[in-house]
Amino acid sequence: MTPTMPTTVADVMTRKVVTVSEQDALDTAEYGMHRMHFRHLPVVTANGTLVGLLSHADLLHAASSSLSAKEAERNALILQQPVKRVMQREVLTVQPEDSLVQAGKILWESKIGCLPVVNDEGALLGMLTKSDFVRLALQLLGSDVKLSDVEDLARARHG
């Protein structure tokens, strides 16, 4: 039996997503990003509603925004700030039934790395990333390479 061709966001999205809250300290978010090798963390309320997105670039921007203090002191102070101080509040999203073609166009044209997947009420259901599209391309090309092998190779090359 031939597997069906993925056509919707739900077919390829990452369902197990690490999230942070607006009140979490930036150092908690940074640790999660580093440990899990993520570049984006969705920011959600206690009931799972998406309220923002924190990117690695947001953390770098926050760290470079206060040049007057000594570097170590500045970084310590910045990382104690809550996520809500630097997160992106205007976030492009998709829904599970949206087409992969449309979602891919949004990623490409907006020059972003991920799209949170939400339901009609705004509850986070997963994430669609550029890596999900690479994994899909490898599968469609008949590669027997597992995504975990690709991730291990990337970690070895980029630390």
Model-derived segments and their meaning:
Residues 20-37, 43-45, 93-111, 118, ...:
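The conserved cystathionine-beta-synthase
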Residues 33, 41-58, 107, 115-132:
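A glycine-centered beta-loop-beta connector
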